[in-house]
C-alpha cells in the first residue's frame, strides 16, 4: 500500500476538511470507503467528477469503493448549499435516475480489481424495510436537536424567509444512518464528499460512535468554483453531464478548453490524474504557448470520461469546426450538425442578404456595428473563410449541401444556419 495517497490528495488541493489527524495513517492500509450521489438527475455532472476521480484514485491504491446512489435520500432532498427547498421528484423519476446513474458510474470503476472490487448500492434497499416507529426510536433518538440546528445548512435555512420543512431537516439523519449501515454491513470506515457534505458526514460519524462504539472517518474536498466565484461545470446550455447522451464529448471538450488561465492549474489538479510535476510543467508553458494547458485539461478529462473513442470524436469535431480550416466533408458536416449551435432561418432571410444582417439574425452577434468591428479586426468568417468586405452578400454559391452555411466570430464562436426553402 502506498504511503502517499493522503499526500497526493493534499498536494493537489483535494482536501477541504478531514475529521481526524489520524486519517493519513489510516490510509496507509487498505480500507473500504463510500461516496454518495443522490439521483436528482439521470447523470452525474462535472461537479461530481471530483468525488468519482478520488474514488478511482483510492481504488487504484487498493481501497475498496462503495458508491451509494441515494434512491431514498433522493426522495427527500438534501438542503446542503441550497437557499430554497428542492421540488420533490416522483418515485418513478427517482428510479429511472437510479438506473441511469448506476450505468454511468460503472464505467469509471474496476470491477475486476483483485482486492478492491467496488459495489454500487442503493439506500432505498434498507430504508424501505424500516417503519417510522422503528426509525424514530432506534435512529432518531441518537440525534440531539441542538447539534442538528447548529449545522450551517440548517441554521441558514431556518432563519430565512422560506424556512425549512421537517422533510429536509431529517435528511442529515438519513445520511448519517447510511454511514452506520455501510460500516456494519461492509466495514466502511471512511466517507468522502464535497465540502457541503461535511455536516452530514459528521452526523454519520457521531451515530456510528454512539451505536457501535467505533471510530469512522470523513474527508471532504472543495466544491468546484471558478476564480470569479461562479460554480464550475455549467455552460450556457446547463450542466456539463458525464452521460454522453446529455453532453457530447465535443461539448465537454469545448467547455474545458475555454477555462481561463487563472483557473486551469486548479482544474488540472482536481479533474485529472496527471502528477503534479507534469501539471507544473504544463502551466509554466502558458505564457509561451497560449491554450496549451487548456487543451491538455480538455484532452485528459474527455479521455477519462468518454474513453479514446470519445476523445477522438471531440478532437475530430473540434478540427472540423475550427474557422480557417473547417472540414466540409460528410464527416465534418455531420459533426457540425450534431455539435454546433444551430438555427433555422428562411432562405429569404439569408440569400441575397448582407453578411452583416445574417450574422445578427443568426444570434451570433447582437448588433451590426459589432459585426462591422469584427470584420475590421479580421475575425469574421463564412464557412471558415475570412470575410473582409463589410458589404459582402451571401448567395447560393456559398451554401453547403444546398441548405447550410456557418457564420463564425473568431475561432471559438460559430453558428450553423439551416435554410428553410
Predicted regions and their residues:
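Short glycine-rich loop/turn motifs that provide flexible caps or phosphate-binding loops at active sites
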Residues: 35, 46, 69-70, 76, ...
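Conserved nucleotide- and phosphate/pyrophosphate-binding catalytic cores
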Residues: 210-421
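NTP-dependent nucleotidyl-transfer catalytic core
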Residues: 1-193, 197, 205, 212-217
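Conserved phosphate/anionic-ligand binding catalytic regions in large, soluble enzymes, centered on
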Residues: 200
